[in-house]
Protein backbone atom coordinates (compact mmCIF):
# COMPACT_ATOMS: atom_id res chain seq x y z
CA UNK A 1 0.00 0.00 0.00
CA UNK A 2 1.30 3.44 -0.93
CA UNK A 3 -1.71 5.60 -0.07
CA UNK A 4 0.04 6.87 3.07
CA UNK A 5 3.02 8.16 1.06
CA UNK A 6 3.08 11.81 -0.05
CA UNK A 7 2.45 12.74 -3.66
CA UNK A 8 5.50 14.16 -5.40
CA UNK A 9 6.98 15.67 -8.53
CA UNK A 10 10.14 14.21 -10.06
CA UNK A 11 12.89 16.24 -11.72
CA UNK A 12 15.58 14.63 -13.86
CA UNK A 13 18.51 16.86 -14.93
CA UNK A 14 19.71 15.19 -18.13
CA UNK A 15 21.54 17.87 -20.09
CA UNK A 16 25.07 16.62 -19.37
CA UNK A 17 27.33 14.71 -21.72
CA UNK A 18 29.31 12.47 -19.34
CA UNK A 19 32.73 13.04 -20.90
CA UNK A 20 34.46 10.47 -18.67
CA UNK A 21 32.55 7.67 -20.40
CA UNK A 22 34.34 8.51 -23.68
CA UNK A 23 31.26 7.29 -25.59
CA UNK A 24 29.72 8.38 -28.89
CA UNK A 25 26.72 9.90 -27.10
CA UNK A 26 25.78 11.23 -23.66
CA UNK A 27 26.01 8.42 -21.13
CA UNK A 28 22.30 8.54 -20.27
CA UNK A 29 21.55 7.31 -23.79
CA UNK A 30 23.82 4.26 -23.65
CA UNK A 31 22.09 0.89 -23.70
CA UNK A 32 21.50 -1.20 -20.61
CA UNK A 33 19.45 -4.36 -20.87
CA UNK A 34 17.39 -3.29 -23.88
CA UNK A 35 16.67 0.23 -22.66
CA UNK A 36 18.75 3.35 -22.29
CA UNK A 37 20.19 4.28 -18.91
CA UNK A 38 17.84 7.26 -18.90
CA UNK A 39 14.76 5.10 -19.43
CA UNK A 40 15.72 2.92 -16.47
CA UNK A 41 16.22 6.05 -14.35
CA UNK A 42 12.74 7.29 -15.27
CA UNK A 43 10.82 4.04 -14.88
CA UNK A 44 10.96 3.79 -11.09
CA UNK A 45 9.15 7.14 -10.92
CA UNK A 46 6.74 6.54 -13.79
CA UNK A 47 5.66 3.27 -12.18
CA UNK A 48 4.91 4.96 -8.85
CA UNK A 49 1.24 5.70 -8.11
CA UNK A 50 2.07 8.85 -6.08
CA UNK A 51 3.84 10.61 -8.96
CA UNK A 52 2.15 13.91 -9.89
CA UNK A 53 4.36 14.47 -12.93
CA UNK A 54 7.95 14.51 -14.11
CA UNK A 55 10.08 17.29 -15.60
CA UNK A 56 13.23 16.43 -17.52
CA UNK A 57 15.89 19.04 -18.34
CA UNK A 58 17.60 18.33 -21.66
CA UNK A 59 20.22 19.98 -23.82
CA UNK A 60 18.59 22.33 -26.32
CA UNK A 61 20.04 20.36 -29.25
CA UNK A 62 19.47 16.88 -27.77
CA UNK A 63 18.95 14.56 -30.79
CA UNK A 64 18.19 11.37 -28.82
CA UNK A 65 15.25 12.06 -26.52
CA UNK A 66 12.51 12.25 -29.16
CA UNK A 67 13.25 8.70 -30.32
CA UNK A 68 12.50 7.17 -26.92
CA UNK A 69 8.98 5.81 -26.31
CA UNK A 70 8.77 7.63 -22.98
CA UNK A 71 9.21 10.97 -24.76
CA UNK A 72 5.52 10.70 -25.64
CA UNK A 73 4.35 10.01 -22.08
CA UNK A 74 1.93 12.78 -21.13
CA UNK A 75 3.23 12.81 -17.56
CA UNK A 76 6.68 13.95 -18.72
CA UNK A 77 7.38 17.58 -19.55
CA UNK A 78 10.60 18.77 -21.15
CA UNK A 79 12.53 21.95 -20.36
CA UNK A 80 15.88 23.27 -21.52
CA UNK A 81 18.85 22.42 -19.35
CA UNK A 82 21.27 24.95 -17.91
CA UNK A 83 25.04 25.21 -18.15
CA UNK A 84 25.36 23.34 -14.85
CA UNK A 85 23.22 20.84 -12.98
CA UNK A 86 21.89 23.52 -10.63
CA UNK A 87 20.64 25.57 -13.59
CA UNK A 88 18.92 22.54 -15.09
CA UNK A 89 17.13 21.78 -11.84
CA UNK A 90 16.17 25.42 -11.36
CA UNK A 91 14.65 25.55 -14.86
CA UNK A 92 12.55 22.51 -14.00
CA UNK A 93 11.37 24.07 -10.74
CA UNK A 94 10.43 27.29 -12.52
CA UNK A 95 8.40 25.21 -14.97
CA UNK A 96 6.58 23.48 -12.12
CA UNK A 97 5.74 26.84 -10.59
CA UNK A 98 4.44 28.06 -13.96
CA UNK A 99 2.22 24.97 -14.15
CA UNK A 100 0.64 25.78 -10.81
CA UNK A 101 2.61 23.54 -8.46
CA UNK A 102 2.65 24.68 -4.83
CA UNK A 103 5.70 25.78 -2.83
CA UNK A 104 4.76 23.05 -0.35
CA UNK A 105 4.82 20.25 -2.94
CA UNK A 106 7.53 17.65 -2.57
CA UNK A 107 10.06 17.44 -5.40
CA UNK A 108 12.43 14.51 -5.88
CA UNK A 109 15.53 15.22 -7.97
CA UNK A 110 17.24 12.16 -9.42
CA UNK A 111 20.36 11.65 -11.54
CA UNK A 112 19.71 10.73 -15.16
CA UNK A 113 22.55 8.22 -15.01
CA UNK A 114 21.48 6.44 -11.81
CA UNK A 115 19.37 3.61 -13.29
CA UNK A 116 19.23 1.10 -10.44
CA UNK A 117 16.98 2.86 -7.93
CA UNK A 118 15.01 0.26 -5.99
CA UNK A 119 11.30 0.85 -5.43
CA UNK A 120 11.81 -0.03 -1.77
CA UNK A 121 14.36 2.80 -1.43
CA UNK A 122 12.00 5.26 -3.12
CA UNK A 123 9.11 4.29 -0.84
CA UNK A 124 11.33 4.47 2.24
CA UNK A 125 12.56 7.95 1.29
CA UNK A 126 9.00 9.18 0.78
CA UNK A 127 7.77 7.63 4.01
CA UNK A 128 10.66 8.77 6.20
CA UNK A 129 10.57 12.36 4.96
CA UNK A 130 6.82 12.87 4.57
CA UNK A 131 6.62 15.08 7.66
CA UNK A 132 10.22 16.27 7.81
CA UNK A 133 10.59 20.06 8.07
CA UNK A 134 13.61 20.13 5.73
CA UNK A 135 13.74 17.06 3.51
CA UNK A 136 16.68 14.84 2.74
CA UNK A 137 18.34 12.35 0.46
CA UNK A 138 19.26 8.74 -0.03
CA UNK A 139 22.80 8.05 1.11
CA UNK A 140 25.12 5.22 2.13
CA UNK A 141 27.54 5.21 5.09
CA UNK A 142 31.19 5.15 4.00
CA UNK A 143 32.56 1.62 4.12
CA UNK A 144 36.11 1.91 2.86
CA UNK A 145 39.02 3.60 4.61
CA UNK A 146 39.22 7.20 3.41
CA UNK A 147 42.44 9.14 2.87
CA UNK A 148 42.94 12.89 2.48
CA UNK A 149 45.63 13.66 -0.11
CA UNK A 150 47.85 16.63 -0.88
CA UNK A 151 48.39 18.15 -4.33
CA UNK A 152 51.10 15.56 -5.07
CA UNK A 153 48.78 12.64 -4.43
CA UNK A 154 50.33 11.69 -1.10
CA UNK A 155 48.34 10.81 2.01
CA UNK A 156 47.97 13.65 4.50
CA UNK A 157 45.70 11.84 6.94
CA UNK A 158 43.19 9.05 7.34
CA UNK A 159 39.66 10.43 7.63
CA UNK A 160 37.31 9.19 10.35
CA UNK A 161 34.65 7.46 8.27
CA UNK A 162 32.18 6.96 11.11
CA UNK A 163 30.43 10.25 10.27
CA UNK A 164 30.96 10.18 6.49
CA UNK A 165 28.15 9.30 4.09
CA UNK A 166 28.11 9.01 0.31
CA UNK A 167 25.31 11.13 -1.14
CA UNK A 168 22.96 9.44 -3.63
CA UNK A 169 19.72 10.46 -5.29
CA UNK A 170 16.77 10.98 -5.19
CA UNK A 171 17.04 14.10 -3.07
CA UNK A 172 13.69 15.24 -1.70
CA UNK A 173 12.79 18.82 -0.77
CA UNK A 174 9.82 21.19 -0.84
CA UNK A 175 9.51 23.01 -4.15
CA UNK A 176 9.67 26.50 -2.66
CA UNK A 177 12.57 25.73 -0.33
CA UNK A 178 14.69 24.18 -3.06
CA UNK A 179 13.82 26.90 -5.57
CA UNK A 180 14.93 29.67 -3.20
CA UNK A 181 18.11 27.86 -2.18
CA UNK A 182 19.20 27.20 -5.76
CA UNK A 183 18.30 30.68 -7.00
CA UNK A 184 20.10 32.41 -4.13
CA UNK A 185 23.20 30.24 -4.48
CA UNK A 186 23.44 31.00 -8.19
CA UNK A 187 23.14 34.74 -7.55
CA UNK A 188 25.88 34.42 -4.92
CA UNK A 189 28.08 32.38 -7.30
CA UNK A 190 28.29 29.52 -4.82
CA UNK A 191 29.48 26.13 -6.09
CA UNK A 192 26.58 23.69 -5.76
CA UNK A 193 27.26 20.00 -6.37
CA UNK A 194 23.80 18.65 -5.55
CA UNK A 195 20.47 19.85 -4.22
CA UNK A 196 21.37 19.01 -0.63
CA UNK A 197 24.42 21.28 -0.81
CA UNK A 198 22.16 24.18 -1.82
CA UNK A 199 19.90 23.49 1.16
CA UNK A 200 22.97 23.28 3.43
CA UNK A 201 24.24 26.61 2.09
CA UNK A 202 20.84 28.09 2.91
CA UNK A 203 21.39 27.13 6.55
CA UNK A 204 19.34 23.94 6.83
CA UNK A 205 20.34 20.33 7.54
CA UNK A 206 18.94 17.68 5.18
CA UNK A 207 18.24 14.26 6.66
CA UNK A 208 20.20 11.24 5.47
CA UNK A 209 18.10 8.17 4.63
CA UNK A 210 20.15 5.01 4.23
CA UNK A 211 19.62 3.33 0.87
CA UNK A 212 21.03 0.44 -1.11
CA UNK A 213 24.67 0.63 -2.13
CA UNK A 214 23.87 -0.66 -5.64
CA UNK A 215 22.00 2.56 -6.50
CA UNK A 216 25.14 3.66 -8.32
CA UNK A 217 25.66 6.51 -10.76
CA UNK A 218 27.18 5.57 -14.10
CA UNK A 219 30.33 7.68 -14.36
CA UNK A 220 32.93 5.39 -15.91
CA UNK A 221 32.77 2.44 -18.34
CA UNK A 222 33.28 -0.08 -15.54
CA UNK A 223 30.11 1.18 -13.82
CA UNK A 224 28.05 0.34 -16.88
CA UNK A 225 29.70 -3.05 -17.23
CA UNK A 226 28.89 -3.85 -13.59
CA UNK A 227 25.25 -2.90 -14.11
CA UNK A 228 25.02 -4.93 -17.30
CA UNK A 229 26.13 -7.99 -15.36
CA UNK A 230 23.33 -7.37 -12.87
CA UNK A 231 20.57 -6.29 -15.26
CA UNK A 232 18.50 -9.37 -14.45
CA UNK A 233 17.93 -7.87 -10.99
CA UNK A 234 16.21 -4.75 -12.36
CA UNK A 235 12.58 -4.20 -11.53
CA UNK A 236 12.87 -5.08 -7.85
From Swiss-Prot:
Phylogenetic lineage: Bacteria, Pseudomonadati, Pseudomonadota, Gammaproteobacteria, Pseudomonadales
Protein's job: Catalyzes the formation of 4-diphosphocytidyl-2-C-methyl-D-erythritol from CTP and 2-C-methyl-D-erythritol 4-phosphate (MEP).
Feature type site, description Transition state stabilizer: 20, 27
Protein name: 2-C-methyl-D-erythritol 4-phosphate cytidylyltransferase
Keywords: Isoprene biosynthesis, Nucleotidyltransferase, Transferase
HAMAP family: IspD
Gene Ontology molecular-function annotations: 2-C-methyl-D-erythritol 4-phosphate cytidylyltransferase activity
Alphabetical GO biological process terms: isopentenyl diphosphate biosynthetic process, methylerythritol 4-phosphate pathway
Pfam families: IspD (PF01128)
CDD domains listed in its UniProt record: CDP-ME_synthetase (cd02516)
Family under the similarity heading: Belongs to the IspD/TarI cytidylyltransferase family. IspD subfamily.
SUPFAM superfamilies per record: Nucleotide-diphospho-sugar transferases (SSF53448)
Listed pathway(s): Isoprenoid biosynthesis; isopentenyl diphosphate biosynthesis via DXP pathway; isopentenyl diphosphate from 1-deoxy-D-xylulose 5-phosphate: step 2/6
Claim: Nucleotidyltransferase is one of the keywords in the record: yes
Record site feature (Positions MEP for the nucleophilic attack), residues: 161, 217
Name of the gene this protein is made from: ispD
InterPro entries: IspD (IPR001228), IspD/TarI (IPR034683), IspD/TarI_cytidylyltransf_bact (IPR050088), ISPD_synthase_CS (IPR018294), Nucleotide-diphossugar_trans (IPR029044)
